[in-house]
């Protein structure tokens, strides 16, 4: 069953100020839950306040948004196992598909919102200590014997899967597709990993607060937040090749239909594409999907970095099966 396309309908209803008649809108307050991945805490803390004002202005109703954060794969599993989410805003398409496979999201969710339901993007960079004492410039520096690496566990973290694939893309180019050499490179990289945290924020804590390692492989936004908070302690290195990381959003159909929150949940995700929210994303160091607004942040982001995409890996289903499923390449190289 194809997913009901309500975005335009909701927008037109709100724009025309048509009287709200549904039972849930008739109440003074509505509550929804956004189950998200690890490093979106600051983004949604700011966005939820803005959205509440928008919803109140358009409908007269107050909305309270409860947040849940953790490693993206773990969060998807929690929702599939019963954590009630009106919306999911996860690190990658595959994790939303896992919720769909559990029967909670209808087919066609990726076409529900613009840009394949990805309102903002990011990429993968290195966070190093001020002065870059180990001289880290590119992925090959991460396999040196004296370099301690921090990155999350790709079995539980969406960001960690983007990290792994970005490293693979670099090795693929360096070794002209020689899979044995690529695997050896990835094996050496993960041999240097000091701790595999379950999520990106945990990895940041290990590196920034606990002082572990020489380099953190990180979401771009997470690295910028660390530099913002500790400008005298850290700096960012952008590798020669990285990956276009595309977080995905979706309404959890089974939950909103049960609670009667489809309208507010849909508008919650739809409003992520508004100019106001696109700038909130940029201010929180996510790359806005709106190209014109992205250009406003040209002094913040390296817009010329060489980015591969998940399509270069055959899409998420193939990438997951090849690299991250039980017995996949990651298990093979990490357990050796």
Please name every model-derived segment:
Residues 1-9, 19:
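Bacterial N-terminal signal peptides that target proteins for export
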Residues 15-23:
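C-terminal segment of classical bacterial N-terminal signal peptides
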Residues 24-102, 112-113, 219:
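Early extracytoplasmic/lumenal segment of secretory-pathway proteins
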Residues 39-42, 72-75, 93-97, 131-134, ...:
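Solvent-exposed loop/turn segments at secondary-structure junctions
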Residues 82-88, 146-148, 209-218:
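Alpha-to-beta junction loops
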Residues 100-173:
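A conserved helix-loop-strand patch within extracytoplasmic ligand-binding domains
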Residues 174-241:
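Ligand-binding pocket segment of bilobal, Venus flytrap-like solute-binding proteins
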Residues 256-336:
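Extracellular/periplasmic juxtamembrane helices and adjacent flexible linkers that interface
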């Amino acid at each position: 069953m194809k997913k009901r396309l309500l975005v335009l309908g909701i927008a037109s209803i709100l724009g025309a100020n048509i009287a709200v008649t549904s039972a849930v809108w008739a109440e003074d307050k509505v509550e929804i839950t956004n189950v998200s991945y690890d490093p979106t805490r600051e983004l949604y803390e700011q966005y939820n306040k803005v959205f509440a004002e928008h919803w109140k202005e358009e409908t007269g109703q107050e909305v309270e948004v409860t947040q849940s954060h953790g490693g993206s794969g773990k969060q998807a599993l929690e929702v599939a196992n019963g954590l009630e989410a009106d919306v999911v805003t996860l690190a990658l398409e595959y994790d939303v598909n896992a919720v769909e496979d559990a029967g909670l999201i209808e087919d066609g969710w990726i076409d529900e919102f613009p840009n394949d339901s990805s309102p903002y993007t990011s990429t993968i960079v290195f966070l190093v200590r001020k002065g870059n004492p180990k001289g880290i410039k590119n992925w090959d520096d991460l396999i040196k014997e004296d370099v301690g690496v921090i990155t999350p566990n790709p079995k539980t973290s969406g960001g960690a899967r983007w990290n792994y694939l970005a490293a693979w893309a670099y090795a693929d180019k360096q070794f002209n597709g020689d899979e044995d050499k690529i695997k050896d490179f990835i094996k050496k990289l993960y041999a240097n990993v000091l701790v595999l945290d379950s999520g990106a924020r945990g990895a940041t804590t290990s590196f920034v607060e606990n002082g572990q390692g020489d380099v953190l492989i990180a979401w771009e936004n997470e690295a910028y937040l660390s530099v913002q908070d500790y400008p005298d302690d850290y700096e960012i290195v952008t590798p020669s090749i990285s990956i276009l990381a595309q977080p995905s959003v979706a309404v959890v159909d089974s939950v909103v239909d049960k609670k009667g929150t489809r309208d507010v949940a849909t508008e919650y995700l739809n409003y992520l594409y508004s100019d106001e929210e696109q700038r909130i994303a940029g201010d929180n160091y996510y790359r806005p999907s709106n190209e014109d607004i992205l250009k406003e942040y040209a002094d913040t982001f390296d817009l010329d970095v060489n980015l591969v995409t998940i399509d270069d890996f055959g899409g998420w289903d193939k990438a997951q099966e090849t690299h991250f499923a039980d017995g996949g390449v990651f298990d093979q190289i990490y357990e050796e």
